[in-house]
Design a protein with these regions (language model features):
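Glycine/tyrosine- and acidic-biased, solvent-exposed loop/turn segments at the edges of beta-strands
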Residues: 19-262
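Bacterial Sec-dependent N-terminal signal peptides
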Residues: 1-26
């Protein structure tokens, strides 16, 4: 066998040995069955599902997950004990969807959500405690102006809620207690004049409700008691009109998320 043939054979042996060692160094468990070291899991189609490291069955350091069709889904940087992770989640188009922190796989602290249409356009911020909204939740228009500010307690609306037109003018101000409308309900035209003034009690209209025209003149007045108009002869149009006005007040949809990452 000449020198060239020997060299080729040695290279082949080294190459195969290297591949074998690489395969053997990933997806390993210890004698107790706990994941240790570098792990790569794949979808049935062969694409990578996740790529990361484990210490005693808990993720450690940088951990990447992918959508089935290859785009990056999330990057999580775990603490040494694997209980906390700084997360960046992505839309399938590659743009950042949200950033925040997980503690024991639950959202904790401030989370920021971004537009699926353009890079670095903040559309919402929310405070979380054990995966539940607690504190201020703010939503924004594409230009960064405030669209809505409201407070949550244990994942329920609780406290003042204000909404704005795109130019920053106040469009709605109301109040919630444990997820139910309670207290004043005030809606405004773009010119700042009141459109609806009323009161809620346990999610039901209560007391006098005043509906105004854009010029400031009164359109009609209706009295409610536990959600029912006191005047049995009330024009159905008035009640329907009031319902329609409330439905059509500015609403900002909850930001889309990239889905389950665990």
């Amino acid at each position: 066998m000449n020198f060239k043939a020997i060299t080729v054979c040695l290279l082949l042996v080294i190459s195969v040995s290297g591949l074998s060692q690489t395969d053997q160094s990933i997806n390993q468990t210890d004698k107790e069955g706990k994941k240790q070291g570098h792990w790569i899991k794949k979808y049935p189609n062969g694409n990578i599902m996740y790529d990361g490291y484990f210490v005693n069955d808990k993720p450690s350091g940088e951990f990447k997950r992918y959508y089935e069709e290859k785009p990056l889904k999330s990057v999580l940087v775990f603490s040494k004990d694997g209980t906390e992770a700084i997360a960046t989640l992505y839309y399938p188009n590659g743009l950042v969807a949200s950033t925040g922190k997980y503690v024991n796989q639950l959202k904790e602290g401030k989370w920021r959500f971004f537009s699926i249409m353009a890079n670095d356009i903040l559309i919402s911020e929310a405070e979380y405690s054990k995966d539940k909204k607690n504190g201020l939740v703010a939503k924004y228009y594409q230009d960064g102006k405030a669209a809505e500010k409201l407070f949550y307690k244990n994942d329920l609306k609780h406290g003042e809620c204000v909404k704005y037109y795109p130019d920053g003018t106040l469009t709605l101000r109301t109040n919630y207690i444990n997820g139910n409308l309670n207290g004043k309900f005030e809606a405004f035209f773009e010119n700042g004049r009141p459109e609806i003034l009323g009161q809620y009690k346990d999610n039901l209209r209560d007391g006098p409700w005043l509906i105004y025209k854009k010029d400031g003149s009164l359109k009609f007045k209706t009295e409610y008691s536990a959600g029912v108009p006191d005047n049995s002869k009330i024009d159905i149009y008035q009640s329907d009109y009031l319902d329609s006005l409330e439905r059509n007040k500015v609403r900002i949809a909850d930001p889309e998320k990239t889905g389950e990452i665990w």
